[in-house]
Amino acid sequence: MVDAHTHLDACGAKDPDSVRAMVDRAEAAGVTRVVTVADDITSARWAAQAATWDERVFAAVAVHPTRTVKFAGAARHALKELAREPRVVAIGETGLDYYWDYSPKDVQQAAFRWHIELSKQVGKPLMIHDRDAHDDVLSILDEEGAPEKVIFHCFSGDAEMAARCIDAGYFLSFAGPVTFRNALSLQEAARIVPERQLLVETDAPFLTPQPYRGRPNEPYCLAYTVRYLAELRGVSVSELASAVNATAERVFGLGHSEQS
């Protein structure tokens, strides 16, 4: 399987040895590849470098919406260069976050539009962070013209929101919160996503799935979310694992793997 969104640096990885050890733990649990995701320029540089240390690691680069206040000039130039690196497979995470008050909405929206254009320029998927901003995210995608591949990372909407995304051809990635007992509307959404548009992720070190909610998360924990989703959707674990692996390979252009 592919962990479609994780943060190896935030999990504690610092160098080739620690990256290898973390991905070894993941592979022992059936997670054969990971996409480590940036939230600022420093982590974007690290992610792009980490993806050269281990063939199982790929990178996504962007500036997180809560960190967009100082996103201009040199930072944008650096991100454009990183986005073209061959081991960088997505532009993310970008989008809108109206929960935290770290960056004004208009600043976030301008940065989001810029990332959308970058995604189209380099021909790589757009990986979206959407927190309490569903309508504005969808509106801006419509206004700007969505890239060919759009991923809603750690999807947090209900079934109605999911249906809108599905109709638009977007990919929905589910993380640990779908396993939480009170996440009924999210679980309803997860039931209706076609396999060809379904991804799974850890968003580690955050949002550890049940039964280990509240403890540190790592890519190896993806298996708990996959097992839960399989039960929720009424399919076998192997069937779901195969489906989400195929979707991830197609979205990120990873090529076929003999392992799931």
Model-derived features: where do they sit?
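Mid-domain alpha/beta scaffold segments of enzyme catalytic cores
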Residues: 1-260
